[in-house]
Amino acid sequence: MAEAATPGTTATTSGAGAAAATAAAASPTPIPTVTAPSLGAGGGGGGSDGSGGGWTKQVTCRYFMHGVCKEGDNCRYSHDLSDSPYSVVCKYFQRGYCIYGDRCRYEHSKPLKQEEATATELTTKSSLAASSSLSSIVGPLVEMNTGEAESRNSNFATVGAGSEDWVNAIEFVPGQPYCGRTAPSCTEAPLQGSVTKEESEKEQTAVETKKQLCPYAAVGECRYGENCVYLHGDSCDMCGLQVLHPMDAAQRSQHIKSCIEAHEKDMELSFAVQRSKDMVCGICMEVVYEKANPSERRFGILSNCNHTYCLKCIRKWRSAKQFESKIIKSCPECRITSNFVIPSEYWVEEKEEKQKLILKYKEAMSNKACRYFDEGRGSCPFGGNCFYKHAYPDGRREEPQRQKVGTSSRYRAQRRNHFWELIEERENSNPFDNDEEEVVTFELGEMLLMLLAAGGDDELTDSEDEWDLFHDELEDFYDLDL
C-alpha cells in the first residue's frame, strides 16, 4: 500500500511510481526495474531521501557495477555486489588474460559447472535440431553407423582435454592425410614412412650441398669454419684461394690452367711497365710516364722505327704543313719513313710485338667509320684498302668492286702510258719552271711505275709498306687527311 504523505507536503509520486512501490512491498525480491529519477536526482541517484533509502537500497547501482558511480557512499542505490544476481563477469578473466587483475571493475569468477552443463546441453540440442532439419531437407546422403559414432565419442571422452597423453597427439604433416586421435584404425606407419622419406631427402640434399665449394672460402675466409655446410676446397698455389675441389680433377686442372694464364698476363704487363717507365720522348725530352697530364702518358709507336716519342709530339710533328711529305712522314732522328703511328700505353720495341700491335691497331680502326666514305654519301680514295669501316646507314658493309675480265690489264696499261707521258713531259720541260706540285707528281708517277714494273704485267705488288707509302704521298698531294 502506498505510503501517505506527511502533513504540509504535496504528494509528487506518480501513478507508475506508486505501483512500483506497491510491488516492491509485496515481493520479497526486488524487481530490477529502475524508475525514472526525479528532477532533483543525479545520474547515480543524488543524496539520501527523506525515507532513509527505502527500496532503492535493495537495487544494485548500475553505475557502481561498471565502476563509474560518482556518488560514492551518498548513493541511494546499493553498492553491494554480493547480493546482486546481475553481476557482470569479466570476459577477459574467463579467457585467462585480464591485465587489470584485482583492480578490474568486472567480476573475476569462473562459471559454475552446472551453468557449463546447461550451456553445453543447450548447444547440443540446438545442433541436433539443426542437423535433423538439414537431413530432412537434403535427404539421406550419408549413412552413419551409430555404434561406431558412439565408440568414437567414448574414445574422445577417454582422450579428451583432460587426458594426460595429449602431448603424444599425432603431428599434422603438410601433404599427408591427417588421421585424428579418435580413429582407432589410424596407425603411425605412414607418418613414420613419410618422415623417413623426408629425412632421406634432407640427408641427400645435405650430401649434395657438401659437394659444393663454399663461396666465402673461395674468395677469402668463411666465418663458419669447420661448421660450414659447404665444402672448403684446397688452396691454390698460384692465387692462394681455397678453390680446388678435392674430388674433381677436371675442375682442379681447369683452375690451375686459368691461373697460369692470368699469371703470364700479369708478368707481361709488369715487364711492359718496367721497360716503359724510363723512356724519354725524343722531341719534348720528357719522361713519358712522368708527364703532368695523365692523358699524355702514351707512346706514339712508328711502324718502321724504334725511336721513342710521345703520341702528342709525334702527331704534331707529322701534321706540319711547312715541310715536305718525306720529312714529316719520316722519323725525326733516323729519317726512316713510317707509314702510320700506333698509339700505345706501353713501349713496344720487338718486331713480333710491334706486328701484334699493328694488327690490333688496324682491327680497332676497322670498327670506326670512314669519314670520306660517309656511309655511302662520299667516296674514299683508297677503296677496299682503307683501314676504316665502309658501312651504310643500315649496317651493310661495302662490297668490293669486281672488275670485268680483261679490264684490269687494260687499266694498268693506260696508267702506265699516262705516267710515261708524265716522265716525257718532265724530261722535255725546263727544270727551273717546275714548282713543288710538279716535282711531287713526277716522284709519285715514278714510284708507281716502279711498283708496276716490279709486279709484272699481270699482278701488282702486295707490299703493304710500299702501298702505305703510296697512300701517304697521294694524301699529301691531294691535301687529304686520312
UniProtKB/Swiss-Prot annotation:
Residues 236-263 are annotated as: Makorin-type Cys-His. SUPFAM superfamilies: CCCH zinc finger (SSF90229), RING/U-box (SSF57850). One of its GO terms (molecular function) is zinc ion binding. Interacts with p53/TP53 and CDKN1A. Interacts with TERT, modulating telomere length homeostasis. It catalyses: S-ubiquitinyl-[E2 ubiquitin-conjugating enzyme]-L-cysteine + [acceptor protein]-L-lysine = [E2 ubiquitin-conjugating enzyme]-L-cysteine + N(6)-ubiquitinyl-[acceptor protein]-L-lysine. The keyword Cell inner membrane does not apply. Auto-ubiquitinated; which leads to proteasomal degradation. Ubiquitous. A zinc finger (RING-type) spans 281-335. SMART domains: RING, ZnF_C3H1. The keyword Metal-binding applies. Residues 40-52 have a biased composition (Gly residues). E3 ubiquitin ligase catalyzing the covalent attachment of ubiquitin moieties onto substrate proteins. These substrates include FILIP1, p53/TP53, CDKN1A and TERT. Keeps cells alive by suppressing p53/TP53 under normal conditions, but stimulates apoptosis by repressing CDKN1A under stress conditions. Acts as a negative regulator of telomerase. Has negative and positive effects on RNA polymerase II-dependent transcription. Keywords: Metal-binding, Repeat, Transferase, Ubl conjugation, Ubl conjugation pathway, Zinc, Zinc-finger. This is E3 ubiquitin-protein ligase makorin-1. PROSITE patterns: ZF_C3H1, ZF_RING_1, ZF_RING_2. GO terms for biological process: protein polyubiquitination; protein ubiquitination. Its EC number is 2.3.2.27. Pathway: Protein modification; protein ubiquitination. Pfam families: MKRN1_C (PF15815), zf-C3HC4 (PF00097), zf-CCCH_2 (PF14608), zf-CCCH_4 (PF18044). Induction: Frequently induced in esophageal squamous cell carcinoma (SCC) tissues. A zinc finger (C3H1-type) spans 55-82, 84-111, 208-235, 364-393. It is an enzyme of class 2 (transferase). One of its GO terms (cellular component) is cytosol. It comes from the Eukaryota. InterPro entries: MKRN-like, MKRN1_C, Znf-CCCH_4, Znf_C3HC4_RING-type, Znf_CCCH, Znf_CCCH_sf, Znf_RING, Znf_RING/FYVE/PHD.
